[in-house]
Amino acid sequence: MARIAGVNIPTNKRVIIALTYIHGIGRTTAVKIADKLGIDHARRVQDLTDEEVLRLRETIDEDLMVEGDLRRETAMNIKRLMDLKSYRGLRHRNGLPVRGQRTHTNARTRKGKAKPIAGKKK
C-alpha cells in the first residue's frame, strides 16, 4: 500500500480513484495531478514505480491543502464566523442550515431527530 499525505491508498485501484481516498482530493483534482505528472489514468497504484509515488507525494504536499491541514482550516473558518457573531456564525452555533434553506419543514439532517412536543395528542 502506498502512503500519501498520511493516508494508505489502495493498491488495486486505478490512480485517479485511489487519490480520491485523500480528504481534499476529488476526481477533478486527481485527474489534474495525474496529467501534470504524466501518469496514465488507467494505471493501477500497484503498477506505479517508487519514483512516481514519490513525485505524487511531493506534488500533493507542495500544491494542495489536504487531510489535517484542510480540516483545521475549515474548522478555523467556521470558528472565526462564530467569534464574529455573523449571521452564518450564529447559524453554525445553533445547528441550523447556513445557506438560506427553509426550516419550517425539513432541515432534519442539520437539526437532528424531531423532538416530540408535550400535549400535542389528538
From Swiss-Prot:
Return the InterPro entries for the record.
Answer: Rbsml_uS13_C, Ribosomal_uS13, Ribosomal_uS13-like_H2TH, Ribosomal_uS13_bac-type, Ribosomal_uS13_CS
List the keywords (alphabetical): Ribonucleoprotein, Ribosomal protein, RNA-binding, rRNA-binding, tRNA-binding
The annotated region (Disordered) lies at 92-122
Q: Where is the signal peptide?
A: none
Q: Which Pfam families match?
A: Ribosomal_S13
A single GO CC term for this protein reads:
cytosol
- For bias type Basic residues, the affected ranges are 101-122
Superkingdom of this protein's organism: Bacteria
Q: Could you cite one Gene Ontology molecular function of this protein?
A: rRNA binding
Q: Name one GO biological process term.
A: translation
Q: Which HAMAP family match?
A: Ribosomal_uS13
Xref: NCBIfam families: uS13_bact
- Which function does this protein serve? Located at the top of the head of the 30S subunit, it contacts several helices of the 16S rRNA. In the 70S ribosome it contacts the 23S rRNA (bridge B1a) and protein L5 of the 50S subunit (bridge B1b), connecting the 2 subunits; these bridges are implicated in subunit movement. Contacts the tRNAs in the A and P-sites.
Q: Subunit structure, briefly?
A: Part of the 30S ribosomal subunit. Forms a loose heterodimer with protein S19. Forms two bridges to the 50S subunit in the 70S ribosome.
The family note in this entry says: Belongs to the universal ribosomal protein uS13 family.
What's the protein name? Small ribosomal subunit protein uS13
Q: Which organism is it from?
A: Erythrobacter litoralis (strain HTCC2594)
Classification lineage: Bacteria, Pseudomonadati, Pseudomonadota, Alphaproteobacteria, Sphingomonadales
